[in-house]
A protein has these predicted regions:
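N-terminal intrinsically disordered/low-complexity leader segments
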Residues: 1-13, 189-209
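Basic, helix-initiating cap at the start of DNA-binding domains
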Residues: 1-29, 37-38, 59-62
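HTH DNA-binding helix-turn interface
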Residues: 28-31, 44, 51-61
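Append "Primarily bacterial transcriptional regulators
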Residues: 34-41, 50
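Amphipathic alpha-helical linker/stalk segments
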Residues: 62, 66-89, 125-134
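Helical hydrophobic small-molecule/effector-binding pocket
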Residues: 86-108, 116-122, 151-154, 158
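Amphipathic alpha-helical packing segments from all-alpha helical-bundle domains
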Residues: 88, 111-140, 144-149, 175-186
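Amphipathic C-terminal alpha-helical segment
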Residues: 103-106, 151-169, 183-195
Length: 209
């Protein structure tokens, strides 16, 4: 027999209603203000129905994280539908940061809300890596390194966008910069291993002079 989820009937407060209010609280005010009292105020009830339905805030948090990841997925998979899917994912990541700054910070910037690194919970990483492999025409460890370098650039732009920094270039300039960085990385990781090692040694020599 299927186990029924608990329902707080008083004031019509249901699990879905609490999850919706908890998600909206995170989306609008960030995880710093995310607590039972604020969620209850938004839902129009006391904190009692929340704990009756969920038992703990950690249980509710898991539901909210899952919903936030769904929003993130929509952005990234939308980017994959562009003419250049891998580049599209980078554009989508920055767009997510700009349009959903508090969700971005809660998921991608700090581990205090999720309790683990974003790389560990990112539901899109498998497909993104496959697109990186196709776009970069590189394999194995090289595609991992290429993607790691691109992530540093794109994440940095995302953090600036989420903070409203005036240093963030407009979309066209950001697009050009992303292309330049990608093409440089692609060319580098297509070089033979010995050539890359030689370049690295030359770089070390220059920095020690």
């Amino acid at each position: 027999m299927e186990e029924r989820k608990p329902r707080a009937k008083k004031n019509g407060i249901t699990r879905e209603r609490v999850i919706e209010c908890a998600f909206d609280e995170l989306k609008e005010n960030g995880w710093e203000c995310w607590n039972a009292r604020q969620i209850a105020r938004r839902a129009g009830c006391s904190t009692m129905p929340i704990f009756r339905l969920f038992g703990s805030m950690d249980e509710l948090k898991k539901e909210v994280i899952a919903r936030a990841l769904k929003v993130y997925e929509e952005y990234i998979y939308g980017g994959m539908r562009e003419e250049k899917p891998y580049k599209g994912t980078g554009r989508a990541y920055i767009r997510f940061a700009k349009e959903q700054p508090r969700l971005f910070k809660a998921l991608c910037v700090t581990e205090e809300f999720t309790g683990q690194s974003f790389a560990a919970i990112d539901p899109t990483i498998g497909r993104v890596m496959r697109e990186a492999e196709k776009a970069g025409d590189v394999r194995g460890e090289n595609v991992k390194r290429l993607h790691a370098c691109m992530t540093i650039f794109v994440h940095g732009a995302g953090v600036m966008a989420a903070s409203g920094s005036h240093l963030v270039p407009d979309d066209d300039i950001c697009d050009l910069l992303m292309s330049d960085v990608f093409q440089a990385l692609k060319a580098y990781y297509k070089l033979p291993q010995k050539k890359r090692e030689s370049l690295a040694e030359e770089e070390k020599g220059e920095t020690t002079e």
